[in-house]
Amino acid sequence: MTSGGKSKGVGSEPGVRVIAENRRARFDYTVDEKVEAGLALTGSEVKSLRDGIANLSDAYALPKGDELFLLNANIGSYKAASFFDHLPTRGRKLLMHRGEIDRWTAKVRERGYSIIPLVLYFRNGRAKVELGLCRGKTHEDRRHDIKERETKREMDRAMRRR
């Protein structure tokens, strides 16, 4: 029998520190694929992330030319940077292999997928983002997910009572 608790994810590995999660994305979208990407950041952005000042709730990624950019990700300003501070919601270049960028860009352009950031974290001192290739859920899909979750809870309760 398996033990309770969280499933193995990004934050359960050694050397990984989760900064921000996009919990709303898992409710609004069906995630078909995931990939890890690096971020091109300024020094004040890295320091803000180390302080945990980030929000991914409205963020998404878009292809521009041969590159992918993370847009609307809010990395708060770093107090000590004053003059050299960054814009909180500026576009940030995503660092991925050329083949991955081309494959994901093709899927986004032809099949109605979106690229949504799921988790922002540090892995061995480097800022990374877990991106999901997502398709929007319909109202019926959301209801189905809620119903599945409820039946699973009821089964767990029944098993504990035995």
Curated annotation (Swiss-Prot):
It comes from the Bacteria. Keywords: Cytoplasm, RNA-binding. Residues 140-162 are annotated as: Disordered. GO terms for cellular component: cytosol. One of its GO terms (molecular function) is RNA binding. Belongs to the SmpB family. This is SsrA-binding protein.
